[in-house]
Amino acid sequence: MQEAGRMQLGPAPIPTTNTISDKKTIAIGADHGGYEMKTALIEYIRELGYEVFDCGTSGKEAVDYPDFALAVAEQVISGRAWRGIMIDGAGIGSCMVANKVPGIRAAMAYDYASAANSREHNNANYLTLGAGLIGINQAKLIVKTWLTTEFGGGRHQKRVDKIMGVEKRFLKEG
């Protein structure tokens, strides 16, 4: 796994396809609270036909979610992963971390509707889940919905462009 602190922030291309392989790769990570759910989801995501890149953690020992949320985001913005999924206790903290990374549009989903909306309306490329808030069956439904829902474009594209404009406006070179 890459060290999270080595990432250079700056304008990054937003990949629309996987640049390493024709098969779509999903980067996935978790803290200790999401480890068991991550393990189950890796198998499920592979069953759906995707490649999986595991960004850690590798056990239930207490770790800091920002490190793993950033590692997943790095895979997405570099183009090594098509999309990213991060699981922590509530899904909120990891979503906040990921949305600090230029080019990431992270959404926390807790049901079918929020997963579909995040893709169709907001073109989210990063999903966060709260292992303490949802069970594995709900998580599988959310992940499948999120991975298979296409961006709606049209009137939503203008709004996503505005999100990107806000990002550019406040982006500071490091």
Where are the regions that the model predicts?
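C-terminal binding/interaction regions
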Residues: 2-13, 21-29, 33-34, 112-174
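Glycine-rich phosphate/diphosphate-binding loop of Rossmann-like nucleotide-binding domains
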Residues: 27-52
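Residues that form or flank phosphate/diphosphate-binding pockets in enzymes
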Residues: 36-37, 63, 93, 137
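Short, structured coil segments at secondary-structure junctions
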Residues: 48, 101-102, 122
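Helix-adjacent hinge/juxtasegments
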Residues: 68-108
